[in-house]
Amino acid sequence: MIELMHGDCLELMKDVPDQSVDMILCDLPYGTTACKWDTVIPFEPLWAQYKRVIKRNGAVALFGSEPFSTLLRMSNLAQFKYDWIWDKVRPSGFQIAKYVPMKRHEIVSVFCNATLNWNPQKEKRDKPIKGRVCSSSDSSPLAHNDGVVRTYDDKNPQSILVYSKQSDGKYVHPTQKPVALMEYLIRTYTHEGETVLDNCMGSGTTGVACMNTGRKFIGMEQDAKYFEIAQKRIHDSIDLPDWLK
């Protein structure tokens, strides 16, 4: 299921049924620029809708940057759980680097009314084998062969997520996030077939990530230009036979 809506998200969310959403994943406007689309949504009516539509154990994961993130956390401190730090690899702020450090990170604040649905995405890591050791899966001895590499799937998630923000011209929105980062967060808090809501979807990256991971998606965007871009990006990401596209 894909449902894309154009308009004011505070009005559009009123049509979303109670407790029908498994995760809210949104890059809200931070209010740090003079751009028309970068206007902070009032927290009180926003949380009223979020709390109504999200399921009891569903995650509300919201991107931010200071000072916006502090205001966001304080707007619902009772349900705040923790922050992820997104390491963008490519820093921004070169123009003002003589006054402040260049910024290489953004924040993802996670909220929930109860115990979070949690599917930790364990990272694969390579470890060279030296000498005679046993397999962790079947206790069978492995041959002496220094330099052999085995892959382990047991590195627990850490609070810093490293996903490079491309600079190759593929970005169509100034605050567009990497698809892989959104996929990681979606897999962490939902299962296949569950529903993700993005009420400020911009160019549709969350929707693309949902299509790639087999999730249902509800997307909302007020800007007509970006709504059209999001529609096309999400449609193009659907794996359909050519005759259905």
Task: Outline where the language-model segments fall.
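Short, conserved SAM-binding/catalytic segment
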Residues: 231-244
